[in-house]
Regions:
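Nucleotide-sugar donor-binding catalytic core of glycosyltransferases
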Residues: 1-201, 205-206, 212-234, 240, ...
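C-terminal helix of von Willebrand factor
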Residues: 244-245
Length: 272
């Protein structure tokens, strides 16, 4: 069997998500980067499995009927050293060749964590004085988010706006998220369907302190990055203590965390 992964690099015909994103998605961008730097990659001894996982997974529900090809193609690969890159929450669900390095942005798999990123937000923070202690604007897409709402919905220090998840996000809703986040000292970044959220990197861009609420530890490059220097890490079991934890962070600490967050923003991008 000739393995032609071109069949698994299909275009994505789907509402843009997040709505401000422009250009390629992670797998598409990395494939181009790989081709442009193939000599350097070849020196590592590893070969890319060039599947646009996100496109194939999403388009399966739109009648593309390509996902059925993935496992036979993987099974037909000659023995060797491989790696792959994926963004979709559920990738990679198929059985990869033994020893394959799977770099994953979604967080529902068991691979090597990658940041879940896209292009920059089309706005810069304009508010320096924060009039909101802690906020969340987003979808009710995981029990952790439900628990946060149930715990703090009646607390005036929290502004929580949750709705059912939808593919399309109107401009008014995006602008509301930007405004509320920019005005917040702390902005909640609880996991949704996937272990990661675009929200974490959006919060950094909007000059707020991310509060990562997690049940599964999924922190990309944690051997290189001190997450607690610019964000607050809250396990799901600690949601009831979340406010006390935030209240114990001094104004000086908050200022230092915001500065550190700004310093790190440049690491979380793959488009200009």
């Amino acid at each position: 069997m000739i393995v032609d992964f071109k069949e698994l690099r299909i275009p994505l015909i789907h509402p843009t998500y997040p709505p401000y994103h422009t250009g390629k998605y992670m797998e598409e961008y990395f494939y181009e980067f790989y081709l442009n730097n193939k000599k350097e990659f070849d020196q590592t001894g590893f070969t890319l499995i060039p599947i646009f996982w996100t496109n194939v997974y999403i388009m399966e529900g739109k009648g593309a009927n390509k996902r059925r090809l993935i496992q036979p193609y993987l099974n037909a690969l000659p023995q060797g050293k491989y790696f792959t890159v994926s963004q979709h929450d559920d990738a990679v669900a198929e059985q990869l060749p033994e020893g394959t390095l799977s770099f994953e942005g979604g967080g529902n798999g068991k691979g090597i964590p990658l940041p879940l990123i896209c292009s920059k937000m089309p706005t810069k923070p304009t508010i320096n004085k924060k009039d909101i202690f802690c906020s969340f604007v987003g979808s009710a897409s995981h029990p952790i988010r439900d628990t946060i709402r149930e715990t703090y919905i009646n607390d005036s220090d929290f502004q929580l706006y949750m709705k059912p998840w939808t593919h399309a996000i109107p401009d008014a809703q995006l602008n509301f998220f930007i405004d509320i986040t920019n005005r917040s000292k702390f902005s909640l970044s609880p996991r949704g369907y996937g272990a990661q959220s675009f929200r974490f990197y959006e919060i950094l861009q909007l000059n707020s302190i991310p509060v990562i609420v997690y049940d599964k530890k999924w922190f990309p490059f944690e051997d290189e990055i001190d997450y607690e220097s610019f964000s607050v890490l809250i396990h799901a079991d600690e949601i009831c203590n979340l406010k006390n934890i935030l209240n114990n962070i001094s104004d000086k600490q908050q200022k230092d965390m915001l500065k550190r967050g700004k310093d790190l923003i440049g690491m979380y991008k793959y488009t200009k």
